[in-house]
Amino acid sequence: MAHTKVAIIGSGPAGYSAAVYTARALLAPTVFTGPESGGQLMYTTEVENFAGFAEGIQGPELMFAMRAQSERFGAVMRDELVTAVDFSQRPFKIWTELPDGTPYELYKMGKPEELHEVMTTLRKTEPQWTADAVVLSTGASSIMLGVPGEKELLSKGVSTCAVCDAAFFKEKTVFVVGGGDSAMEDATALSKFAKSVTILHRRDSFKASKIMQERVLANPKIKVLWNTQVLEILGAEKVEKIKINENGVEKELPAEGVFMAIGHKPTTQVFADQVQLDGHDYLVTRQSATKIGLDAAQAALTEEGLIAYPTMTSVEGVFAAGDNVDVRYKQAITAAGQGCSAALDVERWLERQ
C-alpha cells in the first residue's frame, strides 16, 4: 500500500490544472488518469477557444502539454483506473485493482447495482493507495447512441461538441441528434457555419425550452425531422451518409457531420455512495450552481461572509472540479480554472490540518 499527500482522480483540463498547482505547492500529487487519459479533448480535433493559442491547438496536443507541464513540477502520473474509494475517514482509501474475473467494461457500461457489488467487495480488501486529500476530476462523457459507425467515425465527422467544432463544418451538411436545450444550442451554433442543419428527433415535439425552440424553428437554415431514429453512420475515412428511420421508413441521407446532443453523463459512479450527488449525478460542492450547492455554501460561510473551500464536496478533504461538477458551462477553459481553484483549496485546507 502506497501513500500520497494529494490524489487527483481523473485527468483532462481540470485534473491536469489541479496537478500543476498542487505540484508547484510541493504537495507531490499523484494523478490517477485512468487508462484513457486526457478526457473528452482527446476526441476533439481543433481547439480554438482555449485562450493563449492564436492559431488553435489539437485537443490531444493540449492534453499532452498539460500532462507534461504537471510532470515537470513533480506530479506523478498513474495510468490506472480507480475502481473504488472509501472516504469515511482519513487517510482516504483508494483501490486501483479489480476482483478476478471482473471486466473493465463494467465501469463504462455496467449496471449501478453490479458496480456497487464490486466496490463493496473491494472495500473488504486492503487498498492500493491512501491519501490525505483528494480532488475528483473525472469529468463527464457525452451520451452516445451506440449505433454502428458512431465510435469508428468519432472526430471524423461525428462530434459531441458543436461549440468546439462548428467552424470546421463551414458550408457542409450536418445533422444534430437530440431534442433538448443542448440540441437547440448546437443547431443554432452550427447554422452560423454549415450549409444546412437538420435536427433528428425521435419524438414529435421538443423538450427544450420554448424560447430555444422558437429560435430554432424560425431559423431558415435549420430543418427538423420528427419521429426519426438514427440507425447507422456511414463512411470510410469520414462521415459520408447517415441511415435513419423516419416515421417507419428507412432511408440514407448524405451527411458530412453528425453531432450528438442527447446529454452528458457525469463520471461519478465510483463516488456515488461516498459523497453527495445532485439529482443528475453531478458532484455537489459548496459553489455548485444548484439549490443543494447553495445550502452547502450557506453552511460553510466564514466570519467574513466568504465560502470556506468552495470546491469542497460533502466530505471534508475531498474536492471536485471540472465537468463532473459543472452543470452549466462544460468548457475546457472553465474546467481548467476549476482545477486551479480546487488545488488552491487543497493547499489551504492541508495547511490547517
Indicate residue ranges for each PLM-predicted region.
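Redox-cofactor binding/interface segments in oxidoreductases and associated redox assembly factors
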Residues: 9, 136-137, 176, 260
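FAD-site-proximal beta/loop scaffold in flavoenzymes
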Residues: 141, 146, 152-168, 262-329
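Beta1-alpha1 glycine-rich phosphate/pyrophosphate-binding loop at the start
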Residues: 4-73, 178, 182-210, 225, ...
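A Rossmann-like FAD-binding core segment of flavoenzymes
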Residues: 67-120, 129-131, 191-305, 348-352
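Phosphate-coordination loops involved in phosphoryl transfer and adenosine-cofactor binding
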Residues: 3-5, 79-80, 170-172, 227, ...
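A conserved FAD-binding loop/helix module that cradles the flavin
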Residues: 184-186, 304, 309-310, 315, ...
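A structural signal for the hydrophobic beta-strands that form the central parallel beta-sheet
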Residues: 77, 136, 160, 224-226, ...
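Short amphipathic alpha-helical segments
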Residues: 19-20, 43, 146-149, 187-189, ...
